[in-house]
């Protein structure tokens, strides 16, 4: 039996003492899921991590990833979670992946949107963010504004569109939620019912994406997104933070940055 000690865990990750299934084995992440849709992700060190995640050392993650067939049944044991011949122990160190809205938020400058990285649905980032916005993005932003104003919104119409484990529109909505929290337009009280009128989101998008979106509505975001908003107040760090954000997934980073830009424009009162 090989014992794995996580380096770090998110304090908002679900309680590991419940029944899990192996939901996906990837180069940088291993997903475990409950019947109710709770997600626990084992992340490879150096790849950032999400609000439902534990971070494993590179060598230990690679050994675990390479040693799994994909059909193992996770077992909860006294020390942690057993996966095949590996036991991932309960983490000892935790951190809070929740945004703290700054007193004086610094906006994302328009120049940072002049990037060639591809979004999932609207071409290069520079084109997707240019005026006039594509009609679909204008409608998406209008729907987000209505939701912030308290209008009951069924997000199933918008989610699940585009490629990826977290589809493009889902990432764009995550970016808009990040902007809303950053600028103080959402808080714990207003964020809690954000998806209340959306029924079962897993009917239209992936379970992984649903988990990230529900966390985002409550102000919990993956570490690269938090690094990005922190870096907006420190010009020396902004370029590196944006590069790290844009490196996420195939188009996830670009779609998220596009969403933040759309949310920022909305909250600054720009048409």
Curated annotation (Swiss-Prot):
Keywords: Magnesium, Transferase. Optimum pH is 9.0. No enzyme activity is detected at pH 6.0 and 7.0. Activity increases in the pH range of 8.0-9.0. Optimum temperature is 30 degrees Celsius. It catalyses: oxamate + carbamoyl phosphate = N-carbamoyl-2-oxoglycine + phosphate. Its EC number is 2.1.3.5. Coiled coil: none annotated. Oxalurate could not be used as a standard substance due to its unavailability, and the enzyme reaction was performed in the reverse direction: the synthesis of oxalurate from oxamate and carbamoyl phosphate. The OXTCase is composed of 3 subunits, AllF, AllG and AllH. Belongs to the AllH family. This is Oxamate carbamoyltransferase subunit AllH. It comes from Escherichia coli (strain K12). The lineage of its organism: Bacteria, Pseudomonadati, Pseudomonadota, Gammaproteobacteria, Enterobacterales.
